[in-house]
Amino acid sequence: MSYSCEYTPLNMALVPMVVERTLRGERSYDIFSRLLKERIIFMTGKVEDYMANIIVAQMIFLEAENPEKDIYLYINSPGGNITSGMSIYDTMQFIKPNVSTFCMGQAASMGAFLLAAGTKGKRFCLPNARMMIHQPMGGFQGQATDIQIHAKEILKVKNRMNELMAKHIGKTLQVIEQDTERDRFLSANEAVDYGLVDAILSHRI
């Protein structure tokens, strides 16, 4: 997780299209819009403002569609900006639907934090997924007094993130502080034992 205001431009790529045939004719969707109809949201790549805004908007839209049905958040992310990630986190906690989280590939840093923040009992990973937790990183430059101000702020952020992680994982704050002092990598089995996820899914139930 990084404590910075840096903007990362969206990496545009070719998005597959799917065609549905109905009595009224054919309708085409990009694959992510079609999956959104199934209440599936993808969080892939670095967490930054543009991506976070899209995910937040999708969650609010799905809540308006049906506040009783689960939302499924698929995560494959190396982490990213803390404030961007916290906008997703706060929305997950705010909306009425349960948010079931899935890790495919990796969930590192803010990705792991959001994975753990899913509804208890509905947090999953695939067998070869990798998780990583650590403390926030900062890279502020400026006058000495400003650096001191930002250093105090990042320590406050670190403590708050650790408190939330402890709540969702079910460990003490002291354990989380110790375990996130350096990069801590977890395999699927280790993530279950640690409490980051609730189960490993090797096939659809």
From Swiss-Prot:
Transmembrane segments: none annotated. Pfam families: CLP_protease. GO terms for molecular function: ATP-dependent peptidase activity; ATPase binding; serine-type endopeptidase activity. The keyword Hydrolase applies. Its EC number is 3.4.21.92. It is an enzyme of class 3 (hydrolase). It catalyses: Hydrolysis of proteins to small peptides in the presence of ATP and magnesium. alpha-casein is the usual test substrate. In the absence of ATP, only oligopeptides shorter than five residues are hydrolyzed (such as succinyl-Leu-Tyr-|-NHMec, and Leu-Tyr-Leu-|-Tyr-Trp, in which cleavage of the -Tyr-|-Leu- and -Tyr-|-Trp bonds also occurs). GO terms for cellular component: cytoplasm; endopeptidase Clp complex. Its main location: cytoplasm. Fourteen ClpP subunits assemble into 2 heptameric rings which stack back to back to give a disk-like structure with a central cavity, resembling the structure of eukaryotic proteasomes. This is ATP-dependent Clp protease proteolytic subunit. It comes from Baumannia cicadellinicola subsp. Homalodisca coagulata. The lineage of its organism: Bacteria, Pseudomonadati, Pseudomonadota, Gammaproteobacteria, Candidatus Palibaumannia. The gene is clpP.
